[in-house]
């Protein structure tokens, strides 16, 4: 069987820079370098996404119904749009980082010679009663509780989090408002709108694609490494009893990290083809991409949807990564900048003077086809994915630390490019899209990997970019 080349015919999704399709998000990251017409078009698109303006009969209008030109949108909303995109201070719709909820434990003892007592509803009594409690009935619903020993209580309290920045979707853009979302976790709502953006970016109706392939020649590979941790997923599942609430019938199922693929198959494509969910920490998208290109190269599928969706801006994720010392904190940034006022927009600093990475939410998807089908349909081809390399690190003490697998992965990728394009093309016209996580360890280890691989292939000038500086991790 002739091996087919997987090509990208559509891409889309959303992150802190906005919508990915047609390079809208990329334009936001380089907006300072764009000419005025291109800048104003980008701002107008973001203004619509953020519900600052709307499009009526092909014209931009504000909330009062006044027609706006691109220049007027620029003058009125540019500052607000720029401040409400990319990495920035965490907004209260996600979490109040100055007053994060937690339970404070306090020990209570009675005044000498006096019992400690309180009145409560009978239905609020714990089961079973503590052995040192005495309960006297006051009426049909209330009781008097007397404590004969010291007691420990947990009370609601609030404290500031040391981590205060994240890559958030543009302010005002709510994925769940774009379709009939019922108790869907944020990450799954992002999945629905993200994959829809990618499909529409192909410029070809999905039914037209399906007329050219068999139903089982479509595959979907998508997942999320952190699962769904908001109140509609695992977050609510694990918090409900501790908060005195009830677990719902949806929280467990919707929290699974396989749900992005399931939602795409059931709610968007109606697919009966191959499906799967592969997770691999920061490289989850690439793990799924590897499965996708294997399906096309082997001839098992002709169309593959690949992607991932993460919504980790919640207290649990911030506390967890923060406990590892992995996140950029306000104090760490203050020490780097040498001033009391912190610029949270500069929290993510790949290969620079940094103190940790910056969490971010995003959903990104690509539509792959074999090259023959793409040409038959007249699809726009944005690029090819001939291979994805993933290697383990062998024996090591720290799972998160880099190892020999990183060197093998990068070297194999460069060798593959040399085989396809020739050594001159790689030496003179290639660049590296680095992981660039913005941790002190990464800036050293990844730099060493790139330097040693470049030396092995005699690459003297190798441009390196790290988009996490704009959109977070």
Q: What residue spans do the PLM features occupy?
A:
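ACP-dependent fatty acid/polyketide chain-elongation machinery
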Residues: 1-180, 372-384
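Conserved small-residue
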Residues: 195, 220, 285, 292, ...
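Acyl-CoA/ACP chain-elongation machinery
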Residues: 300-355, 388-402, 436-443, 461, ...
């Amino acid at each position: 069987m002739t091996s087919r080349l997987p090509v990208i015919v559509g891409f889309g999704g959303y992150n802190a820079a906005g919508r990915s399709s047609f390079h809208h998000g990329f334009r936001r990251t380089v907006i300072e370098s764009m000419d005025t017409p291109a800048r104003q078009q980008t701002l107008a698109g973001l203004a619509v996404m953020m519900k600052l303006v709307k499009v009526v009969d092909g014209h931009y209008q504000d909330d009062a119904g006044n027609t706006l030109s691109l220049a007027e949108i620029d003058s009125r909303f540019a500052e607000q749009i720029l401040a409400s995109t990319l990495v920035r201070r965490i907004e209260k719709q996600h979490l109040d980082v100055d007053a994060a909820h937690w339970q404070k434990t306090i020990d209570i003892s009675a005044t000498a010679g006096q019992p400690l007592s309180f009145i409560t509803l009978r239905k609020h009594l714990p089961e079973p009663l503590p052995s040192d409690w005495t309960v006297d009935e006051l009426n049909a619903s209330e009781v008097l509780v007397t404590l004969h020993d010291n007691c420990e209580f947990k009370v609601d309290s609030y404290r500031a989090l040391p981590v205060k920045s994240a890559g958030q979707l543009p302010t005002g853009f709510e994925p769940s408002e774009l379709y009939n979302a019922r108790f869907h976790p944020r990450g799954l709502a992002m999945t629905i709108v993200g994959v829809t953006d990618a499909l529409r970016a192909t410029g070809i109706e999905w039914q037209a694609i399906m007329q050219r392939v068999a139903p089982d020649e479509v595959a979907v590979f998508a997942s999320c490494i952190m699962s769904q941790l908001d109140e509609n997923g695992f977050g609510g599942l694990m918090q409900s009893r501790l908060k005195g609430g009830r677990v719902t019938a949806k929280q467990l199922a919707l929290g699974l990290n396989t749900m992005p693929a399931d939602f795409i198959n059931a709610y968007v494509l109606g697919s009966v083809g191959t499906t799967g969910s592969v997770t691999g920490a920061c490289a989850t998208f690439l793990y799924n991409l590897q499965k996708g290109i294997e399906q096309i190269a082997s001839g098992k599928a002709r169309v593959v949807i690949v992607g991932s969706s993460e919504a980790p801006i919640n207290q649990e994720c911030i506390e967890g990564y923060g406990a590892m010392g992995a996140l950029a904190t306000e104090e760490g940034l203050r020490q780097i900048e040498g001033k009391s006022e912190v610029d949270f927009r500069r929290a993510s600093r790949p290969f620079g003077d940094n103190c940790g990475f910056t969490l971010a939410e995003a959903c990104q998807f690509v539509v792959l086809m074999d090259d023959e089908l793409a040409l038959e349909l007249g699809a726009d081809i944005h690029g090819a994915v001939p291979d994805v390399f993933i290697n383990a690190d062998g024996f090591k003490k720290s799972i998160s630390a880099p190892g020999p697998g990183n060197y093998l992965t990068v070297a194999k990728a460069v060798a593959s490019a040399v085989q396809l394009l020739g050594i001159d093309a790689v030496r003179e016209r290639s660049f590296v899209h680095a992981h660039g996580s913005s941790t002190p360890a990464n800036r050293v280890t990844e730099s060493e990997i790139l330097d040693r691989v470049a030396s092995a292939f005699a690459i003297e000038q190798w441009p390196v970019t790290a988009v996490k500086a704009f959109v977070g991790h």
